[in-house]
């Protein structure tokens, strides 16, 4: 891993709900963004759609493994049901790099907190010590990311990692995308963020919203 400024971000499984919005914000902020998908063609199609929104040609679609190999840092945004299989297939390409895992193992139809360990702890154990895993972005509604791309978002990102550099880079990514971010401890703590997703889904359903999220009070950055 490197201390240099990270310039290339791979959004792995980036054709779903969360990935495209993150890709738009990071591309707008000046990062080179790679959209990864199980099939390169799908990644290329979504990348073309995002480039059209931004009126640029800065986002590239690739197969997940190729995107992970080319990137300085990768962000995993696959559906939680594909979490383990995606990690196993990506392990060789992620060696020596940082992976930010956005996974929250929540059934949207019946949201309940998952059992520990956290998804990010599972990822770290599967990938081994040669990959530095951080967890972030679990509590961010996908729908808010595409709005007002040049404006900061009124929400906070909670970042978890056992590796200081991985946490720092995840925070930098969040801030690059217009989000305030906090180091919230190690990977074991990430189970709390997954549980908060269940809470937010329940609240959004009750109050007929799609954009409910979290903001920290009483801590100044």
Regions found by a protein language model. Name each.
Residues 21, 25, 126, 173:
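Rossmann-fold NAD(P)-dependent oxidoreductase module
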Residues 53-54, 58, 63-98, 102-108:
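Rossmann-like NAD(P)-binding element
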Residues 5-8, 96, 154:
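Phosphate-coordination loops involved in phosphoryl transfer and adenosine-cofactor binding
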Residues 155-221:
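Active-site-lining helix/loop region of Rossmann-like oxidoreductase modules
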Residues 61, 132-136, 182-184:
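General beta-strand structural signal in soluble alpha/beta enzymes
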Residues 103-143, 147-149:
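Rossmann-fold NAD(P)-binding glycine/threonine-rich loop
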